[in-house]
């Protein structure tokens, strides 16, 4: 894409898909990760974002048409908030298994997508960051698949706690 007079490679524009999608070790089939230095890789193979945040963002940003995938996520889910999910938790979706690795920390590409000068700061301040998953078991996932906790990392921080710790270090 063209942004501020420069050509920028990005995979942040995502669209919902119908039907099953193959989950590989490094990404979902058909997914593009433009900058492997900061996105993707084994510990950031899949980006998950809670659907519950969308209503809040649509109102706050005055973007009523902001649709699923609007934050560059691969999976938009129900019931997996940063307050309950812990770093290290293992999830099963469809025939694939995942492990929660870290919160998503925003970069300028979120600014490209949302086009609000303070979006990176607001994203962190609200704690509505979503989180990355590594792929523990390759398989297939589809819209409507149940999400099950396979194992909980009771000693690990919640994603919200990890975001708060990061934010307090930056202040």
What is the role of each PLM region?
Residues 79-81, 127, 137:
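Short loop/turn positions at the edges of beta-strands in beta-sheet-rich folds
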